[in-house]
């Protein structure tokens, strides 16, 4: 069902447009002054009224990212490529997605320590998650999609790694504007990596999730037997 491909595309477009909208509002109401220095994403979203929009964007992106992580995990498992690497990807994807919500709801001007924790979860663990996806794609059986997915994922992941390193080095040496630009590039690459999942999600025919298992008590003479039935 090609409609599943719209999910990662929607996340990429929604997140990109949403963050630049926050930037535009911050510039228009003078919350940030781009003539002095280029602002970090978190700085743009730290002041009202755009802080409310920033928090909601991060929350929605968190939910969409969690959804994508689960579907991707199940897709790889259903293709018979279940492995510890896939499980590690699921765990990292979950934690990094929660980090998106944390950094959006705990602004740096209020609780900076929690905000930085969320940023570390989102950036570092998110980068690790996408590297895992790149290697899973690389070791997958050859296909028409993999011919371009492998190089695209490795290029984007390499660029993200470079941006993370440059961002911390530039910030620690006082080049805040350059570090902020690296952060924006990093986040845009993350959205691009999410969007790339559309190439694989378009092959999904059906997605099913079992939400409850109910025990049925069956009486047989004096013995009691419990059976398990999936309730979907």
From Swiss-Prot:
Coiled coil (residue ranges): none
Tell me the Pfam families matching this sequence: Frag1
Q: Where in the cell is it found?
A: Cell membrane; Endosome membrane; Cytoplasmic vesicle, Autophagosome membrane
Extracellular compartment ranges equal: 28-50, 105-115, 175-177
Q: What ranges does the Cytoplasmic topological domain annotation cover? A: 1-6, 72-83, 137-153, 199-232
Source organism superkingdom: Eukaryota
**Which GO terms of the cellular component aspect does the record hold?**
autophagosome membrane; endosome membrane; plasma membrane
Sequence similarity: Belongs to the DRAM/TMEM150 family.
Return the PANTHER family for the record: FASTING-INDUCIBLE INTEGRAL MEMBRANE PROTEIN TM6P1-RELATED, MODULATOR OF MACROAUTOPHAGY TMEM150B
Q: Main role?
A: Modulator of macroautophagy that causes accumulation of autophagosomes under basal conditions and enhances autophagic flux. Represses cell death and promotes long-term clonogenic survival of cells grown in the absence of glucose in a macroautophagy-independent manner. May have some role in extracellular matrix engulfment or growth factor receptor recycling, both of which can modulate cell survival.
User: What name is this protein filed under?
Assistant: Modulator of macroautophagy TMEM150B
Tell me which species this is from: Danio rerio (Zebrafish)
Gene name, Swiss-Prot/TrEMBL: tmem150b
